[in-house]
């Protein structure tokens, strides 16, 4: 078997990626989230496949088909809640994965980082179109509000919105195409994830110290396979607790009401994992400005390698930037909270301050703290 895994055309790819891969000996549990994201993707594709067997993408039957899955299909309720809460687990792992990349300076691996940003955007798009499928009140109005933002694009905006809708409003054509997108996008994510891994294995993994670890590598198997398995069991435990005991805690009560174009919910809001971006969107009174801020809130991640002037790798030995980093995380939590609040004082003001702080930390404070720390090293 040893010879086979090293010489077989297919098995040697697996061998170089997951068995004999030279890995830094000191990577911590923060490095577990890559494998957890892979696990989440597998869970989502499998549960999604079984849901798609019973779901109908028609405005008259979509809501009923989801109810039918929960009531009449064997373990349909479990599959549906694993899928819905699996999306939340996916985004928790995703945000921690990105946060770890920022903290430990993984953005210096340019290709891996940029593919990661594409993966983040694709996952957000997949989650958005998936949220529309149950055809509840919040699904319908969320789709209407978010797709309508594209009308802010000069000249082509209105045409683009009607093209995406497949008509003059969110209707049957929209639901059908959103189902098609939601089915194909996870496989595109899987393909991008392989490219992400390919680029990562070209350079090798980063490590907590931020130092070159070429002289201290260990094989991925059995050390990190067992470590990843522990993470996977913990993830599955949390997911099962969510799906079995608190299945609707992260959902919206409005989605228990079938979509009604004549009745608008009091507060239109997306799923919790989009609330930070939604708060940034709402904090700018101008429509086009809000849309640009929304897009930039994710694309600004691409500026980390450009704005990095530090002579040290990662934040482990940089206390000034560490403080700014944790302020940034706290600010993100504030934005998430504000995104779920009604548009009224004082929430609008807090949202505007938090949005300005979000961009200021990345564009101004982190580069300034880098310069300060570089000068301290010279002393």
Curated annotation (Swiss-Prot):
Chain residues that bind heme b b566: 97, 196
Segments forming a coiled coil: none
Binding site for heme b b562: 83, 182
SUPFAM superfamilies linked: a domain/subunit of cytochrome bc1 complex (Ubiquinol-cytochrome c reductase), Transmembrane di-heme cytochromes
Subcellular location field: Mitochondrion inner membrane
Cofactor(s) listed in the protein's UniProt record: heme b
Membrane topology recorded in Swiss-Prot or TrEMBL: Multi-pass membrane protein
Cofactor note: Binds 2 heme b groups non-covalently.
Pfam families documented for this protein: Cytochrom_B_C (PF00032), Cytochrome_B (PF00033)
GO CC annotations, alphabetized: mitochondrial inner membrane; respiratory chain complex III
PROSITE patterns: CYTB_CTER (PS51003), CYTB_NTER (PS51002)
Keyword vocabulary terms for this entry: Electron transport, Heme, Iron, Membrane, Metal-binding, Mitochondrion, Mitochondrion inner membrane, Respiratory chain, Transmembrane, Transmembrane helix, Transport, Ubiquinone
UniProt entry tagged with the keyword Heme: yes
TM spans (from-to): 33-53, 77-98, 113-133, 178-198, 226-246, 288-308, 320-340, 347-367
Keyword Zinc: no
Function: Component of the ubiquinol-cytochrome c reductase complex (complex III or cytochrome b-c1 complex) that is part of the mitochondrial respiratory chain. The b-c1 complex mediates electron transfer from ubiquinol to cytochrome c. Contributes to the generation of a proton gradient across the mitochondrial membrane that is then used for ATP synthesis.
Quaternary context: The cytochrome bc1 complex contains 11 subunits: 3 respiratory subunits (MT-CYB, CYC1 and UQCRFS1), 2 core proteins (UQCRC1 and UQCRC2) and 6 low-molecular weight proteins (UQCRH/QCR6, UQCRB/QCR7, UQCRQ/QCR8, UQCR10/QCR9, UQCR11/QCR10 and a cleavage product of UQCRFS1). This cytochrome bc1 complex then forms a dimer.
Protein name from the UniProt record: Cytochrome b
Species per Swiss-Prot/TrEMBL record: Akodon paranaensis (Parana grass mouse)
Taxonomic lineage of the native organism: Eukaryota, Metazoa, Chordata, Craniata, Vertebrata
């Amino acid at each position: 078997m040893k010879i086979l895994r090293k010489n077989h055309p297919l098995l040697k790819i697996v061998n170089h990626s997951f068995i004999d891969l030279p890995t830094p000996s000191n990577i911590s549990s923060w490095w577990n989230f890559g494998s957890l994201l892979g696990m989440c993707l597998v869970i989502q594709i499998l549960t999604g496949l079984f849901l798609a067997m019973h779901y109908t993408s028609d405005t008259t039957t979509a809501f009923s088909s989801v109810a039918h899955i929960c009531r009449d299909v064997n373990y349909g309720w479990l599959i549906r809640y694993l899928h819905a809460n699996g999306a939340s687990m996916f985004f928790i792992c995703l945000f921690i994965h990105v946060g770890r990349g920022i903290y430990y300076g993984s953005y210096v691996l340019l290709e891996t980082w940029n593919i990661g940003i594409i993966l983040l955007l694709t996952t957000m798009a997949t989650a958005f179109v998936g949220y529309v499928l149950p055809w509840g009140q919040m699904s319908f109005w969320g789709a209407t509000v978010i797709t309508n933002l594209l009308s802010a694009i000069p000249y082509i905006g209105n045409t683009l919105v009607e093209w995406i809708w497949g008509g003059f409003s969110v209707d049957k054509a929209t639901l059908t195409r959103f189902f098609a997108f939601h089915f194909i996008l996870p496989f595109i994510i899987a393909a991008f994830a392989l490219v992400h891994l390919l680029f990562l294995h070209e350079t090798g993994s980063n490590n907590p110290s931020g130092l070159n670890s070429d002289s201290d590598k260990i094989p991925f198997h059995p050390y990190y396979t067992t470590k990843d398995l522990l993470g996977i069991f913990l993830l599955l435990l949390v997911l099962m607790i969510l799906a079995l005991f608190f299945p609707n805690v992260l959902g919206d009560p409005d989605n228990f009401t079938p979509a009604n174009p004549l009745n608008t919910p009091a507060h239109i809001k997306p799923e919790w994992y989009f609330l930070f971006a939604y708060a940034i969107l709402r904090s700018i009174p101008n429509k086009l400005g809000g849309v640009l801020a929304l897009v930039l809130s994710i694309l600004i991640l691409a500026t980390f390698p450009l704005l990095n002037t530090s002579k040290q790798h990662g934040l482990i030995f940089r206390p000034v930037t560490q403080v700014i980093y944790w302020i940034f995380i706290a600010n993100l939590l504030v934005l998430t909270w504000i995104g779920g609040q009604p548009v009224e004082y004082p929430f609008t003001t807090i949202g505007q301050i938090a949005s300005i702080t979000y961009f200021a930390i990345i564009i101004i404070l982190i580069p300034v703290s880098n310069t300060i720390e570089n000068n301290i090293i010279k002393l």
